[in-house]
């Protein structure tokens, strides 16, 4: 236990929280350019071809971003918006692509949960 005198001389250092999304620099989203668009396989026990993109952000970071939804129009040099949020079965993927923003089209066939996929309300 520190004495009062010791605490006056050198106060206690506050604990620093480590962020799960360092590339965002405390911003809600960041813009970037796709350097590579490809599929990868999840870890056990899951099996699929998950669509991901390697993205060069405006702040110089290069990160891997997951492309959610069925089908996408992304290719190399597409400009996209990324947000935080990891993909549990893809190691190293800590970011999600925002659908319906910049060059990334929304998911046309979406009827429910549309806002997360950039889909407009269908004409009934």
UniProtKB/Swiss-Prot annotation:
One of its GO terms (molecular function) is structural constituent of ribosome. The keyword DNA damage does not apply. One of its GO terms (biological process) is translation. It comes from the Bacteria. Keywords: Methylation, Ribonucleoprotein, Ribosomal protein, RNA-binding, rRNA-binding, tRNA-binding. CDD domains: Ribosomal_S12. The keyword Phosphoprotein does not apply. InterPro entries: NA-bd_OB-fold, Ribosomal_uS12, Ribosomal_uS12_bac. The modification 3-methylthioaspartic acid is found at residue 89. One of its GO terms (cellular component) is small ribosomal subunit. HAMAP family: Ribosomal_uS12_B (MF_00403_B). With S4 and S5 plays an important role in translational accuracy. Interacts with and stabilizes bases of the 16S rRNA that are involved in tRNA selection in the A site and with the mRNA backbone. Located at the interface of the 30S and 50S subunits, it traverses the body of the 30S subunit contacting proteins on the other side and probably holding the rRNA structure together. The combined cluster of proteins S8, S12 and S17 appears to hold together the shoulder and platform of the 30S subunit. Belongs to the universal ribosomal protein uS12 family. Part of the 30S ribosomal subunit. Contacts proteins S8 and S17. May interact with IF1 in the 30S initiation complex. NCBIfam families: rpsL_bact (TIGR00981). This is Small ribosomal subunit protein uS12. It comes from Shewanella sp. (strain ANA-3). The gene is rpsL.
């Amino acid at each position: 236990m520190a004495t009062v005198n010791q605490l006056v001389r050198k106060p206690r250092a506050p604990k620093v929280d480590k962020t799960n999304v360092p590339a965002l620099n405390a911003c809600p989203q960041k813009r970037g350019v796709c350097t590579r668009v490809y599929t990868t396989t999840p870890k056990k026990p899951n099996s699929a071809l998950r669509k991901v993109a390697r993205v060069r952000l405006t702040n110089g970071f290069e990160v891997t971003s997951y492309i959610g939804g069925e089908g996408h129009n992304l290719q190399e040099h597409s400009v996209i918006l990324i947000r935080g949020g990891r993909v549990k079965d893809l190691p190293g993927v800590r970011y999600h692509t925002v659908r319906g923003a910049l060059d990334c089209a929304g998911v046309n066939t979406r009827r429910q949960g549309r806002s997360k996929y950039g889909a407009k309300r269908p004409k009934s």
